[in-house]
Amino acid sequence: MEIEASRQQTTVPVSVGGGNFPVGGLSPLSEAIWREKAPTEFVGDVSARLTWQDLTVMVTMGDGETQNVLEGLTGYAEPGSLTALMGPSGSGKSTMLDALASRLAANAFLSGTVLLNGRKTKLSFGTAAYVTQDDNLIGTLTVRETIWYSARVRLPDKMLRSEKRALVERTIIEMGLQDCADTVIGNWHLRGISGGEKRRVSIALEILMRPRLLFLDEPTSGLDSASAFFVTQTLRALSRDGRTVIASIHQPSSEVFELFDRLYLLSGGKTVYFGQASDAYEFFAQAGFPCPALRNPSDHFLRCINSDFDKVRATLKGSMKLRFEASDDPLEKITTAEAIRLLVDYYHTSDYYYTAKAKVEEISQFKGTILDSGGSQASFLLQTYTLTKRSFINMSRDFGYYWLRLLIYILVTVCIGTIYLNVGTSYSAILARGSCASFVFGFVTFMSIGGFPSFVEDMKVFQRERLNGHYGVAAFVIANTLSATPFLIMITFISGTICYFMVGLHPGFTHYLFFVLCLYASVTVVESLMMAIASIVPNFLMGIIIGAGIQGIFMLVSGFFRLPNDIPKPFWRYPMSYISFHFWALQGQYQNDLRGLTFDSQGSAFKIPGEYVLENVFQIDLHRSKWINLSVILSMIIIYRIIFFIMIKTNEDVTPWVRGYIARRRMKQKNGTQNTTVAPDGLTQSPSLRNYIATRTDGARRW
């Protein structure tokens, strides 16, 4: 675990992004992680120079047809610069960003050359970071807590706790989040920070380890003009600290556009312009499409290369809703498709293209040091402990995670208790006890699917952190299990106690203990099942439907609605009833409740032994102990959690490989070639997520 500071830390000013901030005295380890990554000179092993030449990305369709999403792109990104990728929707901005960051889909193939510091190398964790468009954050944590827990799962164990705190505060100041540092992120019932602040928190999480190369997918999407300007200004400040920043931008304002150092303009996957952002005005004017006065330059550039405007004009013209007036605008005289062709052709014959090409050649000749931060250095135990604590805090603060379910469980069990109040040992109590157990272990446990939306949110956070190599799958699965256990114990013991004593089930502490343990195990099995579903179903509505369907089938073969010996043997009896936890729960609870009791007979003075009821009414095997039934349910918890782990690993490793293999097969069959196991010459298939993460976490634990 972390080493506590045993001495008084001395406050020293540290220069970050042009400013001095007080940070606690740092050990040599901290210096190695931080000072060397925040230089004032963009040279040596502290810089990232990225070049791409003749970059082409081809995707395969379902019928084997291929389509070039990107075609012949050439450009570069240097330390200290903010490069913006712009273009209309569908122009290839996100694909280009994914290609440069090694995140292409399995059915996408890349050709051309992408070099980092003059070398073909994978982007390792700590060297490059990727900020997605969606801000998948834990809404119940404060900004400071969010960054703090992220630091703990990545920074080395041997680093002092006070140093980690200082680095977190430094990052908060760097991103301008100090005013909202103690405000919760916000969720469905907690009002939190603004959208722009959430975006800056997402960026702060990825710059915590001081990556040299930062990719951002539409960081200003969905933000108002002020928030978009603040976020972009922050990115510009980060680039001035020696980082190489590349961001895709959809529709920037004029103020935001002025913050860009370089502009890469795309249309239909082709380069329209690449160069200094300030030179784009002159380029469009030289190409015959000058920017009118009082018009936002970025709006004008996108207007020239967005063919959707032709469709709008045609629609309005057909409906007689567009008034045409004489204009000197060249776009009024030609179609947008023709304008795009003219701009693309002009760029490839202009000085801008040859200057960029020469610069790419120059940078490619410089063989810089291979950038590798060594991966996440936190131990597996520290990662698991931190994730468990973070998840526990989230569950305790989110009213809808477990607290609301606790209230519903109490309400339902009180209803059960009043309906079956003091059920007794009369003849009618035999079926009453059986139906009560069936409802408790069938429909009461069924309510656990209500937590599925929260599971989906957890998976979104995990996927974001996993893609950037924060921690492994095993740490997440174990932490999720441990953090939920206290809440599940609390829910089942409180509701189980109410039900047990109100109904008047078999008296005795061991009988009571078995009942609540069996209820806990059953609820936990449902939770584990829903977590496995959440790992493969991204939509919470679909997940609830699938989970409800599976549990409905399990209840049918539980042995109550249809007695065990009457269930059709093929499939339904074997194996369905044996993989249903309802079956084992009812088998155990029937024995727990009825064995040792005697019931009144109908029209006779003789008493009916509970053992007779078990064998002849409920068809229970008395040779199998009730504790064996409980142990089977407990083993199902482990099995479902293992399935949860396997499903995540399958989505990371197997699914991308299968999709890539199928894509290559279809492409080869379409082309009539013989080789069906390799990509075409010059094409490199995008790596699977496992390979991607493995290269980003080289030296760190992958599990």
UniProtKB/Swiss-Prot annotation:
<keyword id="KW-0597">Phosphoprotein</keyword>
<dbReference type="GO" id="GO:0140359">
    <property type="term" value="F:ABC-type transporter activity"/>
</dbReference>
<dbReference type="GO" id="GO:0080051">
    <property type="term" value="P:cutin transport"/>
</dbReference>
<feature type="transmembrane region" description="Helical">
    <location>
        <begin position="436"/>
        <end position="456"/>
    </location>
</feature>
<keyword id="KW-0067">ATP-binding</keyword>
<comment type="similarity">
    <text>Belongs to the ABC transporter superfamily. ABCG family. Eye pigment precursor importer (TC 3.A.1.204) subfamily.</text>
</comment>
<dbReference type="GO" id="GO:0009897">
    <property type="term" value="C:external side of plasma membrane"/>
</dbReference>
<feature type="glycosylation site" description="N-linked (GlcNAc...) asparagine">
    <location>
        <position position="675"/>
    </location>
</feature>
<dbReference type="GO" id="GO:0015562">
    <property type="term" value="F:efflux transmembrane transporter activity"/>
</dbReference>
<keyword id="KW-0325">Glycoprotein</keyword>
<keyword id="KW-1003">Cell membrane</keyword>
<feature type="transmembrane region" description="Helical">
    <location>
        <begin position="628"/>
        <end position="648"/>
    </location>
</feature>
<dbReference type="GO" id="GO:0009737">
    <property type="term" value="P:response to abscisic acid"/>
</dbReference>
<comment type="function">
    <text>Required for the cuticle, root suberin and pollen coat development by controlling cutin and maybe wax transport to the extracellular matrix. Involved in developmental plasticity and stress responses. Together with ABCG9 and ABCG14, required for vascular development by regulating lipid/sterol homeostasis. May be a transporter of lignin precursors during tracheary element differentiation.</text>
</comment>
<feature type="transmembrane region" description="Helical">
    <location>
        <begin position="513"/>
        <end position="533"/>
    </location>
</feature>
<dbReference type="GO" id="GO:0042803">
    <property type="term" value="F:protein homodimerization activity"/>
</dbReference>
<feature type="domain" description="ABC transporter">
    <location>
        <begin position="50"/>
        <end position="293"/>
    </location>
</feature>
<dbReference type="GO" id="GO:0010345">
    <property type="term" value="P:suberin biosynthetic process"/>
</dbReference>
<keyword id="KW-0472">Membrane</keyword>
<dbReference type="InterPro" id="IPR003593">
    <property type="entry name" value="AAA+_ATPase"/>
</dbReference>
<dbReference type="GO" id="GO:0005634">
    <property type="term" value="C:nucleus"/>
</dbReference>
<protein>
    <recommendedName>
        <fullName>ABC transporter G family member 11</fullName>
    </recommendedName>
</protein>
<dbReference type="Pfam" id="PF19055">
    <property type="entry name" value="ABC2_membrane_7"/>
</dbReference>
<dbReference type="GO" id="GO:0009651">
    <property type="term" value="P:response to salt stress"/>
</dbReference>
<dbReference type="Pfam" id="PF01061">
    <property type="entry name" value="ABC2_membrane"/>
</dbReference>
<feature type="glycosylation site" description="N-linked (GlcNAc...) asparagine">
    <location>
        <position position="394"/>
    </location>
</feature>
<dbReference type="GO" id="GO:0009611">
    <property type="term" value="P:response to wounding"/>
</dbReference>
<dbReference type="GO" id="GO:0015245">
    <property type="term" value="F:fatty acid transmembrane transporter activity"/>
</dbReference>
<dbReference type="Pfam" id="PF00005">
    <property type="entry name" value="ABC_tran"/>
</dbReference>
<keyword id="KW-0812">Transmembrane</keyword>
<dbReference type="InterPro" id="IPR027417">
    <property type="entry name" value="P-loop_NTPase"/>
</dbReference>
<feature type="transmembrane region" description="Helical">
    <location>
        <begin position="540"/>
        <end position="560"/>
    </location>
</feature>
<feature type="transmembrane region" description="Helical">
    <location>
        <begin position="406"/>
        <end position="426"/>
    </location>
</feature>
<dbReference type="GO" id="GO:0010588">
    <property type="term" value="P:cotyledon vascular tissue pattern formation"/>
</dbReference>
<dbReference type="GO" id="GO:0015908">
    <property type="term" value="P:fatty acid transport"/>
</dbReference>
<feature type="glycosylation site" description="N-linked (GlcNAc...) asparagine">
    <location>
        <position position="671"/>
    </location>
</feature>
<dbReference type="GO" id="GO:0042335">
    <property type="term" value="P:cuticle development"/>
</dbReference>
<keyword id="KW-1133">Transmembrane helix</keyword>
<comment type="subunit">
    <text>Homodimer. Forms heterodimers with ABCG9, ABCG12 and ABCG14 in epidermal cells.</text>
</comment>
<dbReference type="GO" id="GO:0005886">
    <property type="term" value="C:plasma membrane"/>
</dbReference>
<dbReference type="InterPro" id="IPR013525">
    <property type="entry name" value="ABC2_TM"/>
</dbReference>
<keyword id="KW-0547">Nucleotide-binding</keyword>
